[in-house]
Amino acid sequence: MDALSQLFYLHGIGYEFTKYTGEQVIFSEDTRKRALQCCGVNTEDEHQIAQLNYQLDVAPWLELAPDTSLVNLTDNLFYIRIDERQRDLPVAITLPKLNVTYERANLHNLAITGDYYVHGVRYIEVAVPLGAIPVGYHQALVSVGEQSKEVQLWATPEKVFQVDDTKRTGLSLQLYTVKNKAGLGIGDFNDLLELCDLCAQQHMDYILLNPLHLLFAQQSERASPYSPNSRALLNPLYICIGLSADAKNNPQLDALLHSDEVKALFNSNEQFINYEKVSAVKYELFKALFSHFEAHASASRRDEFAQFCKQNAQTLTTLNSANPTFDYYLQWQAKLQLSHCQQHCLNKGMAIGLINDLAVGCAGDGVEYQSQQSLFSDNANVGAPPDPWAQAGQNWGLPALNPQQLKNDHFAFYRSLIRANMQGVGGLRIDHVMALRRLWWCFENNHTQDGCYVYYPFEHLLAILKIESHLNQCIVIGEDLGIVPPEVKHALAVSGIYSNSLFYFEKQHDGEFLPLQELPKHCLIMIANHDVPPFCGWWQTDDLDIKRQYQLIDDQQYQQQLHERQQEKQRLLRFIQLHSAEQLSETSDAMCVYGELAKALAHSETRLFALQLDDLDKQTYPVNIPGTNTEYPNWRRVLTHSSNAIFKNNASTLAAVNSIRKGYE
């Protein structure tokens, strides 16, 4: 292997991949060079290449242990690397905060798990058994003879946090679309509280949310929760004014609530959220809350706020705000209300409660990127390889993290990100979970768009998910739609991470829907989500009409897709008829078909089954059309009915699904 090829391998630059057609595609050396250049490597500098190869391949064998050393709690083995001539020396591994030291007189009679020759000297890796260690990150001092090194010892459980292995039902929704009881034009945490009550009454165990990440207050129309300003901070627009302690006895706030601007918003009843108006009004109300806090807050509340700022200083300071205390206050209020909703779920008997959603990346001009720029690649974005729906591939416009820089940072950024998204909830869905293993990088190469897979330190990123899930008592769902490498699928299953399936895509080779008994068990299954049309729209082919209306497809494509949809509907009817005595046809009412489909899927052994609020509301307009930006008003469509009305209208279906899932029928 030549020096450049070695560096490709050590830096995680992919060599080949399997295309959606089944064809094996080998990346050109030119493409791989460009990817390496995006990592800050001068591919024409032989000295730099040799130096990097030494740092990544040889140097680790000259250290007693990696800076971040994983200890799997199934065997409690700690791996030490030594010159084989040092096996007679005593070894000590000290964990100061646990007040524990593990000592051995020598390193003989231990399993050798690897070796490497440097200048003719054999270095070996030996497995040192330790005692029981609590899950978490521990500072450790490793000593062999006179040589010593401080490392982070990550005590990693075999699986992520688990709940009892039983069939559960839940609700999925985009919180901003919920009909706001306060009339302020966007769903908020009080609306979420109401949904907690409604779900608990139907014996549901969880509510799957959209990403609640911070967006752009100064550019309020940038509405995509999947292209956020920061994934570690919350969107203040979800704060319910009335839930804040600072709303009580607040004359300034009361006057604003009776203003013409608020009344206009209250009476607007628009189909699509006007983020500019909503944001302008809510931020005026936020200022009134903050003014009241500054003037009247008790000493205990001030201490609570100060403690929040201290505990979250690293994340809060990324805001780089002109009025930091105000922005920190909003983050505090949002965190309090989210945690209150989660506790309310648990108090009502829900086994999991809220499930948060973590976007795969952040915007290139956001505070997350700007504050951590050294961790990101140069001029490479995250995307997807060519597929039948995007022959040229997809560029999602999200900066790609540099895997080597993540490692050099001791993964502090990723640990902090996962922790922030697991706090105050009972579960976390990881969007595009394959990113733990590899991501498709998009970059310009000789004035044309190019791309390849780049691999990430999978074992460490997976360890963080396992550790944080236990520390936060949080289940993990990995969104694995699309091409999933076999090693990722296996590792996620072994780690107890739920997969995520869309029923629309669960097909056999002949195009028929998978039989119930073949649906994955340790999985979250949904009929639809934010990337596909709501069921009524799909059944009535409204989504195709909308695409034609917005000139996303021409008449010929419309007719072709209409024909394909008719075939799909026939396949769906055949699936339902295997599990239902109801006589249905293509002309059947969409909600009748939906109800029978929901009841059929309720019989599956799949552990998590989510009903989408959009579907229960009989929505025909999608909340998002993938591949569009300004062509369609994505991330804005509001639900037609109140949450209470939606549950009332679907009472019989919800009761039947619950009865089937609980085994009463």
What does each of the following model-derived ranges do?
Residues 18, 163, 181, 363-364, ...:
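Short helix/loop capping segments that flank catalytic or ligand/cofactor-binding pockets
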Residues 618-665:
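Structured C-terminal cap/extension of enzyme domains
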Residues 37-74, 81-104, 113-137, 142, ...:
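Acidic/aromatic-lined carbohydrate-recognition and catalytic surfaces
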Residues 1-59:
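Long, contiguous interaction/targeting segments characteristic
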Residues 145-150:
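Short acidic/polar inter-strand loop motif in beta-rich domains
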Residues 14, 205-206, 351-353, 427, ...:
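Residue-level detector of anion-binding/catalytic polar loops
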Residues 85, 218-339, 361-610, 614-616, ...:
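Alpha-amylase-like alpha-glycosidases and glucanotransferases acting on alpha-linked glucans and related
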